[in-house]
Amino acid sequence: MADFEDRVSDEEKVRIAAKFITHAPPGEFNEVFNDVRLLLNNDNLLREGAAHAFAQYNMDQFTPVKIEGYDDQVLITEHGDLGNSRFLDPRNKISFKFDHLRKEASDPQPEDVDGGLKSWRDSCDSALRAYVKDHYSNGFCTVYAKTIDGQQTIIACIESHQFQPKNFWNGRWRSEWKFTITPPTAQVVGVLKIQVHYYEDGNVQLVSHKDVQDSVTVSNEVQTAKEFIKIIESAENEYQTAISENYQTMSDTTFKALRRQLPVTRTKIDWNKILSYKIGKEMQNA
């Protein structure tokens, strides 16, 4: 083991550690971090070398965070990344510092938001909040308004999770939706992701994603927001239904095919009569 460690550079160790961290299942960042910490056995190297992995994980997972003094949680995403560990909360028009390891927000400060898109962002945010409240028992959303390559763009992010470590499973739903404000119609692009980890008496992960494209009629802010949400609702309902149906099909066919219904002898063992079997006698004589 010592010879192997001598042959692996610190840079390679950090690269491996970072990969473990960025691929941690939802709700299990701390467990993976602690395991990697033991393997690396160098806290300074881990914190300095893998800091980018902590940030990438939180942005990829749409990690929700509560800011003291504000009611709604905001999502940590690449769209709100202002650099230097500061992120944007467009709903409350503030920026804040985020500790990617502790997952804590601090130092909220007023932040200028693109005034020309305020009414568009607010309309979409209001409609999306109502949708998330109706469809997700533990859901959060953040809506951004940006000018990208000269095009005014709305970006809507949704996150919902259930962490049940006592029952040996954790899961997260993420979806991201975009459209450009270009009358009379605009293309809507979405990506939906589901990740579930079940680890009682085994280790099974469901990782799925779907890309969606549609179009929306761009009129006034309120009406366009309503049409935008209709597209989101239809696509997400269809995706959830398809996942459920595929899972049922796998349970009925694929999973059953992985295990024999009967042993090779085509006879079930009566464990109450095990001593009458040859193997039972052999075990007795052992």
Curated annotation (Swiss-Prot):
GO terms for biological process: actin cytoskeleton organization; barbed-end actin filament capping; cell junction assembly. It is found in: Cytoplasm, Cytoskeleton. The modification N6-acetyllysine is found at residues 19, 97. GO terms for molecular function: actin filament binding. The modification Phosphoserine is found at residue 9. GO terms for cellular component: brush border; cell-cell junction; cortical cytoskeleton; F-actin capping protein complex; membrane; WASH complex. Its main location: cytoplasm. The modification N-acetylalanine is found at residue 2. Keywords: Acetylation, Actin capping, Actin-binding, Cytoplasm, Cytoskeleton, Phosphoprotein. PROSITE patterns: F_ACTIN_CAPPING_A_1 (PS00748), F_ACTIN_CAPPING_A_2 (PS00749). Belongs to the F-actin-capping protein alpha subunit family. F-actin-capping proteins bind in a Ca(2+)-independent manner to the fast growing ends of actin filaments (barbed end) thereby blocking the exchange of subunits at these ends. Unlike other capping proteins (such as gelsolin and severin), these proteins do not sever actin filaments. May play a role in the formation of epithelial cell junctions. Forms, with CAPZB, the barbed end of the fast growing ends of actin filaments in the dynactin complex and stabilizes dynactin structure. Component of the F-actin capping complex, composed of a heterodimer of an alpha and a beta subunit. Subunit of dynactin, a multiprotein complex part of a tripartite complex with dynein and a adapter, such as BICDL1, BICD2 or HOOK3. The dynactin complex is built around ACTR1A/ACTB filament and consists of an actin-related filament composed of a shoulder domain, a pointed end and a barbed end. Its length is defined by its flexible shoulder domain. The soulder is composed of 2 DCTN1 subunits, 4 DCTN2 and 2 DCTN3. This is F-actin-capping protein subunit alpha-1. The gene is Capza1.
